[in-house]
Amino acid sequence: MKRRDALKIMGAGVASVFMLNIAPKTHAAILKDREKSKKRLVFYFTATGNSLFIAKQFSDAPLSIPQELKKGNLIYEADEIGFVFPDYAASAPMIVREFIEKAQFKADYIFSVITFGNASVNVAEWWNNFAKGHGLNNNYVNSILMVDNYLPVFDMNEQMKIDKKTDENIATIISDIIARKDFIAPSDMGWFTEDMLKNMQDMHFSQKCNQLIKLDTGRCIECSTCIDVCPRGNFSLTPEGLEYDGKCEFCLACIQNCPQHALSLERERNKDARYRHPDVSLNEIKRANKQ
């Protein structure tokens, strides 16, 4: 065989291996590669896994806000800092607010991604203003539509049937953050008014868990799941059985993750339907929230 022919065969072989084994990187992979060269910290709060799933698109090791709050020195510095959390009544969960109030952050680029299930309304603007009031200046705030896990209003079985185009939307957000885009999502109030939102927030954040959550003692097997997933540590096992008290985050992690459906709200759209993101395990939520 002539040398030139041998080189042609070798070149074809190398090309075929290259084509078989080297696939274009996803946006998430590119972002994680940059995480290795630049220091990026991503903080999240989750109850059913939506926000944790999104946080994992930006970091291989996102940091749980309930766990970070246990630490004494809440001072963070990085090239990029991100926050991922759910929209609660067009605002942030109280535990996220508490973290922002207590911690200090320094970064060249700060981004926030807020998960929601029905209408984002003015949550990006609200969060940007709240954060700015506590010395945190966002370069980028956007929201992403996912399964709505708010049990009083939505049937989880019906929600899971809806294609909310999460993959396409997260790809856009990742592209924005790779480019370090400056963007604050505009408000879309729809039929909501400021007074309506204030009433919703007052109702949502004033709950005590022993008034809100109902326990079916016949179903409860004292498995401790509710204890492990509650970010406020409101549940405990006593000789008399499961007890719970304290100010409720109203995240519904206890109800959604109970394997026996022993916990519920007084009013739900479908008490037989529960939700956890399919790519997030119960153990991940326990590790994120256990007090």
Region locations from a protein language model:
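Ferredoxin-type iron-sulfur electron-transfer modules and their immediate structural context
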Residues: 138-221, 228, 269, 276-291
